[in-house]
Amino acid sequence: MLGANCLESGDGYLRATLGGAIEAKIDWPNSGTRCQGEPKDRPSGVRLSFQRVPGGSPDLLFVFGITGVHEGRPARAAGVNVTVIVQGTNRLYGTLGDSRCTVDSLAQRPLDAKGVYRVEARGFCTQPAHAVRGKDSVLVSTFEFAGRVAFDGESEDAKQPFRIISK
């Protein structure tokens, strides 16, 4: 079952503007949004995911893979691999690398648990995320978020992975 809040502090969020196969203005507040994050390899950085508690329309899952982010350090002009999944369908869009999207700025603030940070970032994409199946594409022209990244590998997030729902 998805948790009801992104950050315990109440200040998590996701905002994004989407065009193309999905036309949407996303404005997800902390309440009702689930977020999780962890370090990633190849290339090294962090991966953050955002999803609304079921019931939203469209039911989307966003994954941001940000290159070159290190524990506790700010980042600028970092490449981002963006994936958008429409839950309950076979629609999956990805930039297939970090050259189409950029994080302008990223800041980290330590939270109570060791190795866990509030990560706030804003950025944009200059090219669309293409459908894995089909010819559609989605342009995430702007995005900004505040979520949680656990660098320690022992977070609650690892115990409760996102459910990808497919029909």
Where are these regions (language model features)?
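Surface-exposed helix/loop patches within compact recognition domains
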Residues: G10-V116
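Cysteine-centric signal of extracytoplasmic or virion-exposed proteins
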Residues: G3-C6, C35, C101, C125
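C-terminal or internal capping secondary-structure element at the end of a domain, subdomain, or sheet
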Residues: D112-K167
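N-terminal low-complexity, Pro/Thr/Ser-rich intrinsically disordered segments
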Residues: M1-I22, A158-K167
